[in-house]
Amino acid sequence: GYGVVVACGGRLGALDGGVFALPRAAALERRLAALHAGVDELVARYQPTALAVEDLYFGRNVQTAMAVGQARGVVLAAAGARSVPCFSYTPQQVKQAVCGTGAADKGQVQRMVAALLSLPAPPEPDHAADALAVAICHLHRLPTGVAIASAAGAPARATGAARKTRSARREVAL
């Protein structure tokens, strides 16, 4: 899923959210190419100051972990090609930022995403709601995240974006 959230003057708003329609029957390389094109199109359209992704953990399902890892690499490469800094958050960090507890369930997260973004109903499908939650998490943690990223040698653009407190910040989460 993907979500685009803007922060302006302490208020949050959803600009876009959904899931990428990837051809299930196509070969892996075609699906990954379609994902790259989708991410590139979102980044070109919304020109986000950052891209945030969720760290996912898979116990014993190696195939799922590999597929998600490949998709994550494509997302990071698409952002890197456009010089958009990337940040990563654990599911617990996302839940804590959105709901106030890292133990929140999926329904709580969806309801809080709707409330924080002033949406009439929780976003659907679930993957879109999750992506919007990751973007909210990033916006809530931005000053800290940028300081950590800058210390680690991240592009100066990330630091500059954090200083633009009066202008709108657009974040894409995948």
Regions found by a protein language model. Give the residues of each.
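Phosphate- and other anionic-substrate recognition elements at nucleic-acid/protein interfaces
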Residues: 1-174
